[in-house]
Amino acid sequence: MSANIDKLHDDHSHTPSGIMRWITTTNHKDIGTMYLWFSLIMFFIGGLMALVIRAELFQPGLQLVVPGFFNQMTTMHALVMIFGAVMPAFVGLANWQIPIMIGAPDMALPRLNNWSFWILPFAFTMMLSTLFFESGGPAAGWTLYPPLSLQGGDSMPFVILSIHLLGLSSILGAINVIATILNMRAPGMTLMKMPIFVWTWLITAFLLIASMPVLAGAITTVSYTHLTLPTKRIV
């Protein structure tokens, strides 16, 4: 009887294996590793776009691509590098180091941590797919200001939705960081005893929560103008 019980309960973790382990994981180290790998992949994609830009600017005149595609590469390079390479890299380091530095077993909201990561691949798949649209990808420059944002064809609403999803991911991650730092420090570790890396992320998280809704409002107005302005097709 006891042998049968031991056989049935020899593994108490019951964790999924294979790809499901990475899809469903709530371990802060696993999620941090996925953030870092995702950042590296986006860095290579953004780097290829930068190579196209630099090759075109190698000397005066048209070299490799038409001006419209050059503008698309400039816009996508900015979005990929900022939201796909730089920010996920720092979030990956935060997932790895913050719980260890403050003596916490994991992030305060592990499932939210998983969700905030898996938003990124879907958002960037949608964003990069606009390059294959008949009207081409967004060609609004780094700032997405009108009037350039009004001539992006059908790709602009998809790009704006992607930025909304990326902002949602950032807000969820910032909430998780704040909850972890304020509630899961080791006994005796006051705010003044925290490492500077943890302090940096605590301040950054508050700034993200304050700034991302402003960005969301700005790009929402751009989307509204793009969809409703009768003269949105500028030639």
Q: Where do the protein language model's features map onto the residues?
A:
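Short, Lys/Arg-rich, polar N-terminal cytosolic tail immediately upstream
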Residues: 2-20
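Early transmembrane alpha-helices of polytopic membrane proteins
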Residues: 200-223
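Membrane-interfacial loop-to-helix junctions in multi-pass inner-membrane proteins
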Residues: 20-40, 101-122, 153-163, 182-207
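Divalent metal-coordination and catalytic microenvironments
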Residues: 28, 77, 181, 217
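Membrane-interface helix-loop-helix modules in multi-pass inner-membrane proteins
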Residues: 54-178
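Conserved small/polar residues in nucleotide/adenosyl-binding loops
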Residues: 225-231
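Alpha-helical transmembrane segments of multi-pass membrane proteins
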Residues: 40-58, 130-134, 214-215
